[in-house]
Swiss-Prot record:
The gene is ADK1. GO terms for biological process: ADP biosynthetic process; AMP metabolic process; ATP metabolic process; DNA replication initiation; pre-replicative complex assembly. It is found in: Cytoplasm, Cytosol; Mitochondrion intermembrane space. One of its GO terms (cellular component) is mitochondrial intermembrane space. It is an enzyme of class 2 (transferase). This is Adenylate kinase.
């Protein structure tokens, strides 16, 4: 083998340096420090499951921004329809005023109406808070398949209940958007203030240990059959939500089969082959 000349070494170093710069840029995007959406031409159609405090309010806005999709939190959507006195909202209000539960048909039709009329939904949607039962999941699938927009992913953020207790007791929420923060783990830039709007944050009255344990028990009882349903369809994917938000985001990108995620992993490859100090 011919001896390695200085020009060859310099050329190799230059190539590695360029690769490192590119990798740093991509890793910055993965951490949310890069430019705008890198997937303007992509779309996503998914439901995001997880117990209260698992991080849905942190990750859903990032997914929304990346894919230019709409985030449909069904509880907020129902309240908005009632406040706007839409036909579905009036129908739902009658039921709620009588102490009843809004029917699955009304909820699915509200989602359908939102998908048809909300321009943000043109490139996809993140559905949060629905379905809660297998019957709802079946009705949702029927509607989406009829409109040729079947679900691509059913992602479940998984986390130990005891860790959730410590998370939720310090949770802060921006009521208008649903963005969530934590006094210790994910504090806002300014105390009790939403980073994006500057509006005040609140701490929900039901964010206490006793109430939370009841909510978790209900969540697990409701969600297990729904998870089993989506496991059978092949679109269910778990994510370890005990990780820091940046790592959870990388796990989500892997699920979405994002090219940037694959490229970002090449940094560890350079370490392995000895080309990165």
């Amino acid at each position: 083998m011919a001896p390695t000349t200085d020009p060859a070494v310099n050329e190799l170093k230059s190539t590695v340096h360029k690769l490192e710069q590119r990798i740093a840029e991509l890793e910055g995007r993965l951490s949310g420090h890069g430019g705008g959406s890198s997937s303007a031409q992509e779309s996503v159609r998914m439901i995001l499951m997880g117990p209260p405090g698992a991080g849905k309010g942190t990750q859903a806005p990032r997914i929304k921004e990346k894919f230019c999709a709409c985030h449909l939190a069904t509880g907020d959507m129902l309240r908005a329809q009632v406040a706007a006195k839409t036909p579905l909202g009036r129908e739902a209000k009658k039921i709620m005023d009588a102490g009843g539960l809004v029917s699955d048909e009304i909820m699915v039709n509200m989602i359908k109406t939102e998908l048809e009329n909300n321009q943000e939904c043109a490139k996809g949607f993140i559905l949060d808070g629905f379905p809660r039962t297998v019957t709802q999941a079946e009705k949702l699938d029927g509607m989406l398949e009829a409109t040729q927009k079947p679900l691509q992913h059913a992602v479940e953020l998984q986390i130990d209940d005891q860790l959730l207790v410590s998370r939720i007791t310090g949770r802060l929420v921006h009521p208008a958007s649903g963005r969530s923060y934590h006094k210790i783990f994910n504090p806002p830039k300014a105390p009790m203030t939403d980073d994006a709007t500057g509006e005040p944050l609140i701490q929900r009255s039901d964010d206490n240990e006793e109430t939370l344990k009841k909510r978790l028990s209900t969540y697990h009882a409701q969600t297990s059959p729904v998870v089993a349903y989506y496991q059978k369809t092949g679109i269910w994917k778990p994510v370890d939500a005990s990780q820091d938000p940046g790592q959870v985001w990388k796990s989500l990108l892997k699920i979405f089969d994002d090219k940037a995620y694959v490229a970002g992993r090449s940094g560890s490859l350079l370490n392995k082959i000895g080309l990165k100090n």
